[in-house]
């Protein structure tokens, strides 16, 4: 493992997940100072501490030092071990917060990862498990991460503030990743969705579907929105409802949008009709931004391109989010990889907004944790 001399130093609580995930993959220790040092409630939050505990569970030999106030963190990564794991996520953030990091790390374990995560499956902050299942899994398949043991399953739904959801994620390991050329997103051919309701009337989901279809039917006939009403113990601990929509293109690109109702006891009550209409509009905005990967998974695709074989990978993205821009800076710090960024102004009227073509040469990252069979 890298010594203290090669460690990277950062300040502040922003992008904590990015730094810890890239540290784990590159083997370079990180020291993060001044984590909310001037806040009334200084130091790491519960959900960040839970994330660090999760990293500790899936690695072997990690060294984690946190000072008394929780404002300084030193993390020396161990080997990614994998295997069967269970983890109770903090209900302050969705399971998507933890799952996004696991999607980056899972292909590089020593043993295939099989993990049960408990907590909030759908909230208003993090990508829901439904969206990650519909968009991130097909994306990983493009890089050659595929197989029977590759699945993401919602066993129970949990809405904030109580949580009570349960998700099973299993992923095979790969020695190397294939380079990709994702430059033509294609045209939208179908829209699929999931309207869910827990601990409220099942009619809520049907009302969401009708209002979402009222907008989307003007553009395309092939729309199917499933309704999912979980009962009893499968419905978690709090009431709520929401909608996730995914548009699929002729070239196998998936673009997503989602909305969830306000948590119980917080904010004004949301009408299912408004939620359905607003979510449909968000999907249309995402389609306008376009690209071969939606804005939720921009950083995931850039990471997998970086870690690919020593060959050129290209991907066409919509406008880069601030999170992705910071991620590119971190990729340069941890892996010394720079992307060629070309703006592609939109010439045609009906092709949406301006695009960005990202090109890089993979570092030929080899999964050292995986044992030779």
From Swiss-Prot:
Gene3D superfamilies: RNA 3'-terminal phosphate cyclase domain, RNA 3'-terminal phosphate cyclase, insert domain. Coiled coil: none annotated. The keyword Nucleus applies. One of its GO terms (cellular component) is nucleolus. As part of the small subunit (SSU) processome, it plays a role in 40S-ribosomal-subunit biogenesis in the early pre-rRNA processing steps at sites A0, A1 and A2 that are required for proper maturation of the 18S RNA. Activates BMS1 by promoting GDP/GTP exchange. Does not have cyclase activity. Part of the small subunit (SSU) processome, composed of more than 70 proteins and the RNA chaperone small nucleolar RNA (snoRNA) U3. Interacts with BMS1. This is RNA 3'-terminal phosphate cyclase-like protein.
């Amino acid at each position: 493992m890298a010594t203290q001399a090669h460690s990277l130093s950062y300040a502040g609580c922003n992008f904590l997940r990015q730094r810890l995930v890239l540290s784990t993959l590159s083997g370079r220790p990180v020291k993060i100072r001044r984590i909310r040092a001037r806040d009334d409630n200084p130091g790491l939050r519960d959900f960040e501490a839970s994330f660090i505990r999760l990293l500790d569970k899936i690695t072997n030999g990690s060294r984690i030092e946190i000072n008394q106030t929780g404002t300084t963190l030193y993390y020396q990564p161990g080997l990614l071990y994998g295997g069967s794991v269970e983890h109770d996520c903090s209900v302050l953030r969705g399971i998507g917060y933890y799952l996004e990091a696991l999607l980056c790390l899972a292909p590089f374990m020593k043993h295939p990862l099989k993990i049960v995560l408990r907590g909030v499956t759908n909230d208003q902050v993090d990508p829901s498990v439904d969206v990650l299942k519909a968009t991130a899994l097909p994306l990983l398949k493009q890089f050659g991460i595929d197989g029977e043991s590759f699945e993401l399953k919602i066993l129970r739904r949990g809405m904030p503030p109580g949580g009570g959801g349960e998700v099973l994620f299993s992923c095979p390991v790969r020695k190397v990743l294939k380079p990709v050329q994702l430059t033509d997103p294609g045209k939208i051919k179908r829209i699929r969705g999931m309207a869910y309701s827990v601990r409220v009337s099942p009619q809520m989901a049907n009302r969401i579907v009708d209002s979402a279809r009222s907008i989307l039917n003007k553009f395309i006939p092939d729309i199917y929105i499933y309704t999912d009403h979980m009962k009893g113990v499968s419905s978690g601990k709090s009431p709520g409802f929401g909608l996730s929509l995914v548009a699929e293109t002729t070239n196998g690109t998936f673009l997503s949008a989602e909305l969830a109702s306000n948590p119980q006891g917080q904010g004004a009550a949301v009408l299912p009709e408004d939620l359905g209409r607003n979510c449909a509009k968000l999907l249309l905005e995402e389609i306008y931004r376009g690209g071969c990967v939606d804005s939720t998974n921009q950083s995931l695709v850039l990471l997998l391109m970086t870690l690919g074989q020593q060959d050129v990978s290209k991907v066409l993205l919509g406008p880069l989010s601030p999170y992705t821009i910071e991620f590119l800076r971190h990729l340069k710090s941890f892996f010394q990889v720079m992307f060629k960024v070309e703006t592609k102004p939109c010439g045609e009227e009906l092709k949406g907004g301006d695009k960005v073509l990202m090109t890089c040469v993979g570092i030929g990252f080899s999964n050292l944790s995986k044992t030779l069979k």
